[in-house]
């Protein structure tokens, strides 16, 4: 293999001298606590220029042409492309996904093929493990097992990805009868540092172990794979097909699992100890044992996925993003979060949605649930399978393998398929002198290279090689359109009638300039993909564009999040920090208000005054003032003219608008592929993450801030390794993974 592409120190110095990163009010602080990796040789975390260098080099070297004796001409061409990408990302005119900011260019990326993708989807039905990195020793690679989708979900969650999963009837009906109840014993050596804490959650001392001929003993290695394989063995023992010897006692030895607080190499962070895994295994065994002699339901399967997610949250990842997708007439699934005890115990771990098609009409109970608690969301698989952009019309089976979506709902996915995201801030990129068509072309090529990663699971490798799906997103959409057009994209509504129900509806009128703007950029992405695919000799991407919810990445640039409207024209935005976080002294020294967090011990809440882009424009609207109808119409605009995947949107609504939910879901059934809704709270909670304020309060609070946090932090020189992130909010629905 040839020596890779690298960016010279001289080039980086020139960019640093000529380009100023477009940090938002929370931008640099958010970057430093979320994406800056620890540099052991320097005894500090990365600076932004170092992060961007790592990320760009990690990506450009995925070009498969570099594998075999590349020409000097090719290396020069890719070096020039890397330099353009570096300048673009350093200035924050565009960024790869948060996952790429954290992982790209690391040893972990080189070891772990799945590490660059944000989110995944898997169907909960018996599947073969195939030629994957994880295959239980008792199974043949081509042998179907009930455990496989749960293993896939567990593995990807522990790698920091989010996972959407389908418990629709068509999948759950393929799971065979639960044949055996399993007597599970979890043991820990008395000499283990974790012994006392493990016993408290249900383990027993190893000296108490009673092993007989009917039992299976497995000592878990201290690895991610060991956790997955233990759970797989437990699940598969319940089924005769994968337990032909009819063994009904399982002993899992967790003595080798590293204790709480120990360092985790690779992904980063610190270990949780064996306790969350012990609780998970015992709880999953209870779910399965309760169905011995019967069959698992969609709720049982979702519970197992939620219990896995709960264990991962308690572990190193700190958030496991899950979306459970059920059948639209499965009332037990739709109402499963009404069980308050189980909701508090584990059912909080997923956002729940139902699959519909355009002929579906039963929105009344769904709308009632949304008004009550914001669930379920809606995923229209019929539209996803047969449409790209809505304006391009019906294309039968254009994405026929689609079965679900990622947790945030912006990418329609086949079984085992991941999201592959990159986002552009069009207003910022234009202000920095970029041609937007070039920016979106660079974005498409970046995402295309990610599809050449060495994926760990066979189902993923096969579908990625077939689809090469990419998701080029734009963010700060409201900022861009309001600034460039002087108005919002929806300029009004006209009266009309639904062609099927004859119900009176109000059809949105869009600014034609906006249609032209996004259409040109869509075509630039498609053209870039076509050209690069031809060069690389691979399939063109099955779909190309999306709108991701953004959140953390949008905070870097200070842009509105995805298609969402700013939460208010002026805000107090609160971020929580561990009391030991070295950023806190710098923030206090700069005049930011801080107070003890009322929800979590040893945590400080820091308040940032924020002014939205365009706040002074008379046509500015916030999430607290824009109507539910305009939000639906805006999502429909982007689904029609920009996104051939889907558009992630959490529509917020006032109490007075709740009665419009049902009719609007019905009106847009031929356009919107996925959506979710939440009541607008407006910062009424104590220490709310976002609290709208007036202009006078904003100006007063801004005057209290007297220093530059980045400069003060550098002067204090008090970096600390492996801090836990506290309460990082990536998107309205809380569905995104933390990095």
UniProtKB/Swiss-Prot annotation:
Regulation of its activity: Allosterically regulated by ATP and dNTP.
Catalytic activity: a 2'-deoxyribonucleoside 5'-triphosphate + [thioredoxin]-disulfide + H2O = a ribonucleoside 5'-triphosphate + [thioredoxin]-dithiol
Region feature Adenosylcobalamin-binding-2, mapped onto this chain: 685-724
Positions of region (Effector region-2): 168-313
Catalytic residues, chain numbering: 408, 410
This enzyme's EC code(s): 1.17.4.2
Chain segments annotated as coiled-coil in the UniProt record: none
Subunit structure: Monomer.
Record-linked PANTHER family: RIBONUCLEOSIDE-DIPHOSPHATE REDUCTASE (PTHR43371:SF1), VITAMIN B12-DEPENDENT RIBONUCLEOTIDE REDUCTASE (PTHR43371)
Family, per entry: Belongs to the class II ribonucleoside-triphosphate reductase family.
Name of the protein in its database record: Adenosylcobalamin-dependent ribonucleoside-triphosphate reductase
């Amino acid at each position: 293999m040839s020596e890779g592409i690298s960016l010279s120190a001289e080039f980086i110095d020139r960019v640093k001298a000529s380009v100023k990163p477009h940090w938002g009010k929370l931008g640099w602080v958010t970057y430093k606590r979320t994406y800056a990796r620890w540099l052991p040789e320097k005894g500090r975390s990365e600076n932004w220029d170092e992060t961007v260098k790592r990320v760009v080099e990690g990506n450009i070297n995925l070009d498969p042409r570099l594998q075999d004796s590349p020409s000097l001409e090719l290396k020069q061409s890719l070096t020039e492309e890397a330099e353009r990408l570096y300048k673009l990302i350093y200035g924050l005119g565009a960024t790869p996904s948060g996952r790429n900011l954290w992982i790209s260019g690391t040893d972990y990326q080189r070891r772990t093929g799945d590490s660059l993708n944000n989110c995944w989807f898997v169907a909960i039905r018996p599947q073969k493990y195939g030629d994957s990195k994880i295959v239980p020793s008792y199974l043949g690679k081509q042998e179907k097992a009930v455990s496989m989708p749960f293993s896939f979900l567990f593995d990807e969650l522990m790698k920091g990805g989010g996972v959407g999963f389908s418990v629709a009837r068509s999948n759950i009906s393929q799971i065979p009868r639960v044949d055996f109840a399993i007597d599970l014993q979890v043991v820990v050596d008395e000499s283990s540092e974790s012994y006392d804490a493990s016993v408290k959650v249900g383990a027993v001392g190893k000296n108490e172990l009673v092993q007989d001929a009917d039992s299976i003993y497995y000592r878990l290695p201290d690895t991610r794979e060991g956790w997955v394989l233990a759970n797989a063995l437990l699940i598969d023992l319940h089924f005769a097909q994968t337990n032909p010897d009819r063994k009904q006692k399982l002993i899992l030895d967790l003595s080798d699992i590293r204790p709480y607080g120990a360092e985790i190499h690779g992904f980063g962070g610190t270990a949780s100890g064996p306790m969350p895994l012990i609780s998970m295994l015992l709880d999953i065994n209870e779910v399965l044992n309760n169905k011995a002699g019967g069959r698992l339901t969609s709720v049982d399967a979702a519970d197992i996925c939620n219990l896995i997610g709960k264990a991962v949250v308690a572990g190193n990842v700190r958030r496991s993003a899950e979306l459970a997708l059920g059948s639209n007439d499965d009332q037990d699934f739709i109402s499963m979060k009404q069980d308050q005890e189980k909701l508090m115990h584990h059912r909080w771990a997923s956002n729940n949605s139902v699959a519909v098609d355009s002929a579906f009409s039963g929105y009344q109970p769904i709308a009632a649930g949304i008004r009550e608690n914001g669930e379920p969301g809606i995923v229209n698989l019929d539209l996803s399978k047969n449409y790209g952009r809505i304006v391009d019309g019906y294309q039968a089976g254009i994405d026929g393998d689609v079965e679900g979506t990622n947790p945030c709902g912006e990418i329609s996915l086949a079984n085992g398929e991941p999201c592959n995201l990159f986002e552009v801030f069009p207003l910022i990129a234009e202000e920095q002198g970029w041609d937007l068509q070039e920016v979106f072309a660079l974005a498409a090529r970046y995402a295309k290279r990610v599809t050449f990663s060495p994926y760990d699971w066979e189902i993923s490798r096969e579908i990625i090689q077939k689809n090469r799906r990419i998701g080029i997103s734009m963010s700060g959409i409201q900022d861009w359109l309001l600034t460039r057009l002087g108005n919002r994209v929806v300029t009004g509504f006209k009266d009309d009638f639904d062609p099927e129900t004859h119900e009176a509806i109000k059809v949105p009128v869009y600014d034609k300039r906006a249609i032209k703007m996004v259409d040109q950029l869509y075509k630039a992405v498609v053209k870039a993909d076509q050209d690069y695919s031809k060069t690389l000799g691979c399939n063109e991407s099955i779909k190309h564009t999306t709108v991701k919810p953004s959140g953390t990445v949008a905070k870097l640039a200070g842009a509105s999040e995805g298609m969402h409207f700013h939460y208010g024209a002026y805000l107090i935005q609160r971020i929580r920090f561990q009391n030991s976080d070295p950023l806190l002294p710098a923030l206090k020294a700069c005049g930011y208000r801080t107070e003890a967090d009322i929800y979590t011990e040893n945590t400080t809440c820091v308040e940032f005054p924020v002014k939205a882009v365009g706040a002074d424009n008379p046509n500015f609207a916030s999430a607290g003032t824009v109507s539910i109808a305009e939000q639906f119409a805006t999502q429909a605009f982007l689904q029609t003219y920009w996104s051939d995947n889907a558009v992630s949107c959490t529509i917020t609504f006032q109490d007075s608008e709740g009665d419009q939910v049902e009719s609007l879901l019905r009106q847009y059934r031929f356009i919107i592929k996925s959506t979710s809704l939440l009541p607008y709270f407006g910062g009424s909670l104590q220490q709310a993450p976002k609290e709208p304020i007036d202009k006078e309060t904003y100006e007063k609070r801004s005057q209290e801030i007297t220093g530059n946090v980045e400069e003060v932090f550098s002067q204090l020189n008090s970096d600390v390794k492996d801090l836990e992130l506290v309460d990082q909010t990536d998107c309205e629905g809380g569905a995104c993974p933390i990095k």
